[in-house]
Regions:
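A short Gly-Trp-Pro
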Residues: 1-105
């Protein structure tokens, strides 16, 4: 992770709702590196690929597969130091803003 995210997104699209992910967003050019192999699922509208661990199935990140999307998402729930403190979300003890995203269409 290149830096602490400013916020994490709680998306209400069909797959994020079901998986319970909270994504930390970074610019596509941020140089995010994922260690180890992942399996991928190409989401319904074929704009992003959602990656998950082939062993345990945890969603790890998503990345764009079309031009024009300038960010990537990392599953914040997998970050060391990430905790949920009641209605607050924390990363290494510091509060993170959660924005509720209406992407259900």
């Amino acid at each position: 992770m290149p830096s602490r995210p400013e916020w994490v997104g709680s998306c209400n699209c069909s797959i994020c709702r079901r998986l319970g992910t909270l994504f930390a967003y970074y610019p596509a050019e941020a140089g995010i590196r994922i260690e180890g192999e992942t399996a991928r699922y190409v989401w319904g509208d074929r704009m992003i690929s959602l990656h998950h661990c082939p062993t345990c199935g945890c969603p790890t990140h998503w990345e764009p597969i079309v031009e024009g999307i300038d960010k990537v998402g990392i599953n914040a729930r997998l970050l060391d130091g990430f905790a949920i403190d009641g209605p607050r979300y924390l990363l290494n003890g510091d509060e993170l803003e959660v924005r509720y995203l209406d992407n259900a269409g």
